[in-house]
A protein has these predicted regions:
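Short loop/turn motifs at secondary-structure junctions and domain boundaries
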Residues: 39-40, 57-60, 188
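Short aromatic/basic micro-patch
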Residues: 47, 90, 121, 197, ...
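Cyclic nucleotide-binding regulatory module and flanking cytosolic helices
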Residues: 1-52, 96-97, 102
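Cyclic-nucleotide recognition modules
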Residues: 89-154
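Phosphate-/nucleic-acid-contacting segments
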Residues: 177-260
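Cyclic nucleotide-binding regulatory domains
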Residues: 28, 54-116
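Polybasic "coupling" helices that flank or enter modular domains
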Residues: 136-208
């Protein structure tokens, strides 16, 4: 089903200025000099607000826009021939949505808002022209894409080689540390807790498991005193023990940050 762009609402009030953007240090324009930010802002068509469950990209459809995620959570997924969803990645603020090896071709995945999201929208044709003429931005795009693929590979390895308990523990730690990293940059991080809007269905579709299996495994991790999920918050009580279960290291999901 084609994307309904009428579901994209212009962000109320003034659009965020690139020079004061709180996620720019994580995003595509990270390395752009302050004096050059005016032209990057001119590339952006608009800041849009998109409601939960709405799609930003559709598998098999050429996209009109690529996006920088300003706030909220987005799932990248593919749909099997029998209609099942397989989530390959969860995008968080600062992430780029809509990377294509060949710009303008149909997407090989869909992207759906899991929460209300705000995005900076860039027309695909205009952004492609800028990337062709700006090697630094092209390099940054490749770095971001490689990092996303690194996270996806770790998850796929888990699906093929780890138990349900190990897989789920790994996913919790992946998202916990990615969200914490963003929070530290934006001075909004709590000690051992993050906002966690994912449903058991989302977790099942990311892990290749049933919702019943997710519920049982989550209860096991909770009963062992490793974590809890309450009121859309994930709290980790014993990170070393959870990391041992998951065979997890932070370096598996975080990249060196040149501005820190």
């Amino acid at each position: 089903m084609p994307i309904n762009y009428d579901n994209f609402y212009v962000k109320p009030g003034a659009a965020t200025q690139c020079h004061s953007c709180p996620v720019r240090s994580l995003a595509l324009f990270q390395g752009v000099k302050p004096e050059d930010l005016e032209w990057t802002q001119n590339v952006r068509e608009q800041q849009y607000v998109i409601k939960p469950k709405r799609r930003l990209l559709e598998e098999g459809e050429p996209p009109r826009y690529s996006f920088t995620l300003f706030s909220g959570w987005v799932a990248f997924y593919q749909t099997s021939v029998d209609g099942n969803r397989m989530i390959s990645h969860f995008a968080l603020p600062g992430d780029f949505i809509g990377f294509q090896a060949v710009p303008g071709h149909p997407m090989d995945y869909s992207a759906q808002a899991l929460t209300e999201v705000t995005v900076c929208a860039f027309p695909v044709t205009q952004l492609d022209e800028i990337l062709k003429n700006t090697p630094e931005l092209s390099s940054r795009m490749m770095t971001m894409h490689a990092h996303t693929m690194k996270i996806c590979r770790q998850r796929m390895m888990g699906i093929g080689r780890k138990s349900a308990k190990q897989r789920l523990a790994f996913l919790f730690l992946e998202l916990y540390h990615r969200v914490k990293f963003i929070g530290e940059l934006m001075q909004g991080s709590e000690e051992n807790s993050i906002v966690f809007p994912l449903s058991q269905e989302d977790l099942a579709d990311a892990m290749g498991l049933t919702s019943v299996h997710i519920s049982r495994t989550l209860r096991e991790l909770t009963d062992e005193g490793l974590l809890s999920i309450k009121h859309r918050r994930l709290t980790i009580y014993n990170e070393p023990a959870l990391a041992e279960v998951a065979h997890f290291e932070k370096s598996m999901v975080l990249q060196d940050h040149p501005l820190l």
